[in-house]
Amino acid sequence: MKKLTIGLIGNPNSGKTTLFNQLTGSRQRVGNWAGVTVERKEGQFSTTDHQVTLVDLPGTYSLTTISSQTSLDEQIACHYILSGDADLLINVVDASNLERNLYLTLQLLELGIPCIVALNMLDIAEKQNIRIEIDALSARLGCPVIPLVSTRGRGIEALKLAIDRYKANENVELVHYAQPLLNEADSLAKVMPSDIPLKQRRWLGLQMLEGDIYSRAYAGEASQHLDAALARLRNEMDDPALHIADARYQCIAAICDVVSNTLTAEPSRFTTAVDKIVLNRFLGLPIFLFVMYLMFLLAINIGGALQPLFDVGSVALFVHGIQWIGYTLHFPDWLTIFLAQGLGGGINTVLPLVPQIGMMYLFLSFLEDSGYMARAAFVMDRLMQALGLPGKSFVPLIVGFGCNVPSVMGARTLDAPRERLMTIMMAPFMSCGARLAIFAVFAAAFFGQNGALAVFSLYMLGIVMAVLTGLMLKYTIMRGEATPFVMELPVYHVPHVKSLIIQTWQRLKGFVLRAGKVIIIVSIFLSAFNSFSLSGKIVDNINDSALASVSRVITPVFKPIGVHEDNWQATVGLFTGAMAKEVVVGTLNTLYTAENIQDEEFNPAEFNLGEELFSAVDETWQSLKDTFSLSVLMNPIEASKGDGEMGTGAMGVMDQKFGSAAAAYSYLIFVLLYVPCISVMGAIARESSRGWMGFSILWGLNIAYSLATLFYQVASYSQHPTYSLVCILAVILFNIVVIGLLRRARSRVDVELLATRKSVSSCCAASTTGDCH
C-alpha cells in the first residue's frame, strides 16, 4: 500500500475533530508543533490503496495573519501547508455555514494543492432547510466535494474512496481580482525563490499585498519590493487588502447563489429556544453554576461507585501480591515492605483516581462538543469585561477544570498580550482534575453529609480567587480595557459517542501516564526516606525516619493554617504536590498507612488473589446498584469512600492528625491556591517568561497562605484568641504592603509588558523556511 500524508483543516466548530476521530479511532498520537506549545495530533488509517497519516491542523477561519500578536493557529496551518509535507488536504466545511467556511476553501484552492472538500454537518443544514447541490459545488470549486455527517459516520467510505482517487484540482479561475492586484502579485512572484511552485508564489504575493506578515518569511527578496508595490497600488485603489477580501467574498456569494439556498434558510428553532434561557442575563450565570455542580456531582457519584474495582483490585494485585511474592521468595522484610509500600502503594494511589478523573473528562468533553461551553464564555463576558478581559478569555479558564496546562496554553487564542498574561496568571486557580482527587478523599474523611457542598465551595473559591487576581492585576500592573468580544455560537447537537470516548481516553491516558510516573517515583523515594534514619540505620517506626526528622523542622511554618507539628506528613504532601497535585494523595496515602503496613502481620498462606478480586468486583457492583439511590444522590461523596473505615487505614490516621474539619478545610484551601504543578509552571514560562512564572508562584503562595490562615484562625478563634488576632492582622498588613508595591511598580511593568515573550513572527522573519515552527 502507498503511504499518504493528509492535512485536515477547517474552521472551528466545523466537526473537524469528530471526523478525525471517526477516521483514526484510537490510532492517534498527541504531541506539540515544533517550537510552540500548541497541540499537534496525528492519526493513522487505511483506505483500499493507501496507508494514511492524518495530521489535524489547528482550527482557523483563514490563512491570513495580520498581527504578530495574534493568529498563531493561522501561522501553524499556513506553514504546514506551504512546507509540502502534505500530499493532500481535506477541508472540512460546515454545510450550515457554507458562506463563511468557503473563505478558507478559496485560499486553499488558490494554492494549487490537491484538495477534497468534506461537506460536514449536513444533518444540521437539513434541519435548517438548507439545500446544497453537491455536484454543482464540486464543479464550481474544481475539486471533489463529499457530503458527510461525521457524528453518525455517514459518508466516511465515500471520503476514503475519494482519497484513493485523488488528483490535482481542476484549473478553474475562482476569484476575479482587479488587474492591478494581479500585476503586482505577479511582479512579487517573479523575485521569490524559484523552487516554490508558480501558483504558490502568486498566492504568497496576494497574501503579502493583503497584509499577511507570515508570508514574508517565504518571500525571500520579494519582501524588499513590497512597499513599492503597495505604493503603486494605492495610486489606483484605497485599500488593497479590502479589495482582495472583497473579491473573494464576491466569488463566495456567486457560488452560494448557484449551489444553495442559504439566504432563505431558517435558524435552528431548538438552539434559539434554549439560548433564550441559557443566555438570559439573569438566568445565565445560575444555570452555568448548576451545570458545573451537576458535572462535579455525577463525576464523584459514578466515579466513586466504580472506585472499589480499581482500589481493592490494585491492593490485591500490587500490594498484597507483592507482599506474597516477597514472603514466598524470602525477601528481607524491609525490601518487601519497601516494594509493597513504594511500588505497590504508588500504583494503588494512581488507579483509584481513574474513575472520577475519567468521568470529569467525559462530562467536560460532552459540554464542549454539545456547544454549551461557548455559551458559558458568552455568559461570563460581562464579568470578564469588569476585569478588563474579553469573555473569550473564560474559555481557557473553563478548560482548567480538566487540567491547568491546556488552560495556560489556550491563552494564545487571545488577541492582546495584556489579556493573554492576565488569563495565564488566573488559570492556576481553577481547580483541576488532580485537585478533585484530593478534595474527594478529604471530603469523605471529614465532611460526611456536607461533603458535596465542601468540594463545590472549593471549586467556587478557585473561580473567585481567579477573578480577584484579575481585578488586582487590572488596578495595579496591567491596566487597560478589553478588546471587543466576537464569538461564534455553534448549534446545539448531541455529541458522537465514539468521539467522546476517544477524547476522554486521550485525556485520561495522558493524566495516568503523567501522574503515574511521578507518583510511583515519589512513593518509592518517600518509602526509602521513611525506612532509614538520618544516620542511615533502618527504623522500625516512621516517626524516627529521616523524612520525619526533616519535615518536623519545616512544619511549624504551617502552624497558622492548622498543620500541627505531629502532622509532618501533611507538610511533605505540600512539597511533593508542587511536582503534581495528584501526588498529594499518594504522599499522604504512603505516609499515613506506613505504620499500618509495618505493624501488619501478612500471612502468605491466607492470601487468595481470586477472592480479593471477586470482592472488588462485588463491592463495585453493590456500589453501582446504590449509585442512583436518593441518599447517594443527595450526598455523592459517600459513594466515593469505597470500603475505607474511618477508624483504620489512611483516612483514620488523617482524621486523627488534622484533628478538626476546620484544619482539613484550611489545608484544602492551601492545596487549591498554592504553587501550580511543575507542568503548569513550565507552560507559564513558555507562554510568557520565567519572570512571570516566578510572579505566579509567589502570588499563589501568598494567596494560599493568607486565605488558609484567615479561615483557620477565624474558625478556631475561641481556642487561642490572642494568637489568632496576631495572625489575622499580620496577614492583612502584609497584603496591604504587597498591593501597594504592585501599584508603585505599575509604570515599569507596563513598559515591559510587550516584551514578555518573543513573538512568533519575529522568530519566523529570521528564517526563510519558517524553521521556528
UniProtKB/Swiss-Prot annotation:
UniProt record similarity statement: Belongs to the TRAFAC class TrmE-Era-EngA-EngB-Septin-like GTPase superfamily. FeoB GTPase (TC 9.A.8) family.
Membrane topology note: Multi-pass membrane protein
Keyword Membrane: yes
A GO MF label: ferrous iron transmembrane transporter activity
Job of this protein: Probable transporter of a GTP-driven Fe(2+) uptake system.
Subcellular locations according to the entry: Cell inner membrane
Residues noted as binding GTP 2 in the record, renumbered to the chain: 35-39
Name this polypeptide is given: Fe(2+) transporter FeoB
Domain of life, per lineage: Bacteria
Pfam families: FeoB_C, FeoB_Cyto, FeoB_N, Gate
Alphabetized UniProt keyword annotations: Cell inner membrane, Cell membrane, GTP-binding, Ion transport, Iron, Iron transport, Membrane, Nucleotide-binding, Transmembrane, Transmembrane helix, Transport
Annotated GTP binding sites: 120-123, 149-151
Residues bound to GTP 1: 10-17
Gene Ontology CC terms, in alphabetical order: plasma membrane
Transmembrane segments: 282-302, 309-329, 344-366, 383-403, 427-447, 453-473, 518-538, 664-684, 691-711, 722-742
Stimuli inducing this protein: Iron uptake is repressed by the global regulator Fur.
InterPro entries linked to this entry: Fe2_transport_prot-B (IPR003373), Fe2_transport_prot_B_C (IPR011640), FeoB_Cyto (IPR041069), FeoB_GTPase (IPR050860), G_FEOB_dom (IPR030389), Gate_dom (IPR011642), P-loop_NTPase (IPR027417)
Source species: Escherichia coli O6:H1 (strain CFT073 / ATCC 700928 / UPEC)
Encoding gene (name): feoB
Record flagged with keyword Acyltransferase: no
Annotated GTP 3 binding sites: 56-59
Domain FeoB-type G: 3-169
